[in-house]
A protein has these predicted regions:
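Alpha-helical transmembrane segments of multi-pass small-molecule/ion transporters
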Residues: 2-314
Length: 314
């Protein structure tokens, strides 16, 4: 028992060291966003650049060049859908059990099942190289539209039109599907085009992590809330950081998977919630301040939980 505990501790420390460069980039983004004259408009513009240009370039290029077998990856992809589906259901249970403020619930429930893709892709690349990155991209290609639809449906009562089209035109989904199609067809890009896309993709992870740090809320006005709001905050955080990775661990024992697939699945499920939850909530008339606190709590708490989950699965 003592030996097993020592092994787990060593693996957790190894994972902490693996996470350290990404945590440092997030911390740098936080520092740069505070008091240096770069206002919110700068960071919003940078986030758009990452989301619409740099990140899609990274995904497309990684999947296009990776030795993929979509058929053999079907078990891990199906497991990811099941885990995220369970997270959506568990998140929605808070409305029935806690009877919280409807607007605050609709705004915050997305944090129980959405994931921070910038951190996920950065860590997947460090764990499994291009193969890990490509596998993570394949999972994201399925999960991104799934969680976006669930998040939008929760906020739909306050939303305007056009959101279904926005989901269908999601740049990350389009890049992933395009890369998978090109890979299946054996597409080889001309060298100048390939080099240009590679350079754009190289800038994606570091820039994306900087925007995550810039979006963290360290101090804000307290939300007008009650016990149900506090309970809901804990509920969403527990679902995202504890229950979803636990379900992913269970899936790895029930479904045959390669070692890298097991690791990426659990890592994917253990990720903190998406920093863009705040953007969606505010654009659809929700409680943006509450969501900003949820995002920050998830990011900070994940520094303790992610190393443990990865140590358990590796």
């Amino acid at each position: 028992m003592a030996a097993a505990g020592a092994t787990l501790h060593c693996r957790a420390m190894e994972t902490m060291l693996l996470l350290l460069p990404d945590v440092a980039m997030v911390a740098l983004g936080l520092l740069l966003s505070r008091g240096n004259g770069w206002d919110r408009r700068f960071w919003d513009g940078l986030e758009k650049l990452v989301y619409f240009v740099l990140f899609p370039a990274l995904l497309f290029n990684s999947i296009l060049k990776a030795p993929l077998s979509i058929g053999s990856a079907a078990p891990v992809m199906a497991s990811a859908v099941a885990v995220v589906g369970a997270g959506i259901v568990l998140g929605w249970l808070a409305a029935r059990v806690l009877k919280p403020d409807p607007v605050r619930f609709a705004s915050g429930v997305q944090t129980a099942f959405r994931f921070n893709s910038y951190v996920a892709f950065a860590l997947a690349q460090r764990i499994g190289g291009e193969a890990g990155l490509a596998l993570c991209a394949m999972l994201a290609g399925i999960i991104v539209p799934m969680v976006n639809v669930a998040a939008v449906l929760a906020l739909a009562r306050n939303a305007g039109g056009g959101w279904w089209n926005a989901i269908l035109r999601n740049p990350l989904v389009m890049a992933t599907l395009g890369g998978m199609a090109g890979n299946a067809l054996g597409l080889v890009l001309p060298e100048p085009v390939s080099a240009s896309i590679t350079r754009l993709g190289t800038a994606a992870l570091a820039t994306g992590l900087l925007t995550v740090g810039a979006g963290l809320v360290i101090k804000s006005e307290p939300a007008a809330g009650d016990r149900s709001t506090t309970s809901m905050t804990v509920w969403f955080t527990v679902v995202k950081l504890l229950l979803m990775p636990a379900l992913a661990m269970l899936a790895t024992t029930l479904v045959p998977m390669a070692p890298l697939e097991r690791t990426i699945l659990v890592m994917f499920a253990a990720m903190p919630t998406a920093s863009t939850c705040y953007i969606l909530a505010t654009r659809m008339g929700g409680d943006g301040a509450y969501v900003a606190r949820l995002v920050t709590l998830s990011m900070v708490a994940s520094l303790a939980t992610v190393p443990v989950w990865l140590a358990l699965v590796r």
